Amino acid sequence: MGISEVGQEMRFGTVCLWRGDRHAYATEVELADSLGYDMICGGDSQSVYREVYVSLAVAAMHTDQARLGPMVTNPITRHPAVTASSIATIDELSDGRAVLGIGTGDSAIRNLSERPATLAGLREYVVALHELLRGRPVDWHGKRIHTSWIQRPVPIYITAEGPKTLELAGEIADGVV
């Protein structure tokens, strides 16, 4: 997986999926970290994989260098306050190594018979997350939400293939997956 932050050279990561034995998963993330991968990611699809933020917490306790994050979460199955709190917790556990990958939704959405987020919905979600990850309150669908305990912002990457999503990522994201 190639990851590019705005103004930075491309780095490489791997996806480690907790599929069974937790000890095997811990060994897998330790190996990826020791091999020098820049990022270790987990899939966020409730019907296919273990809970991504629990997996990332395990990874945080078994790695020292690689950045950690979901690749990718989505605006349909995750409320922005829950996502902000979850990734900020991973950031705290990993001593500042968290990143947040977001897309419109794939298997997590299809398996619930839902539709992926629109680009407008993705924009709204990412903008809200940027604010929440800075400890600022946000008006979300008519309700005021906040995550006042968060200590530092976490970089947000957007999955992008087409020109419209790439343009959106260039406007509001810290990087592209």
What are these regions (language model features)?
Residues 1-71:
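N-terminal beta1-alpha1-beta2 module of alpha/beta enzyme domains
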Residues 2-8, 82-175:
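Internal, glycine-rich beta/alpha segment that forms the wall or movable "lid"
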Residues 10-23, 73-80, 151-161:
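Active-site mouth loops of central-metabolism enzymes
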Residues 18, 46-47, 74-76, 104-108:
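Active-site-proximal loop/turn and secondary-structure-junction residues that shape catalytic pockets
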Residues 25, 37-38, 76-82, 108-112:
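Conserved N-terminal glycine/acidic-rich loop preference
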Residues 67-76, 96-99, 129:
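Short, basic, helix/turn surface patches
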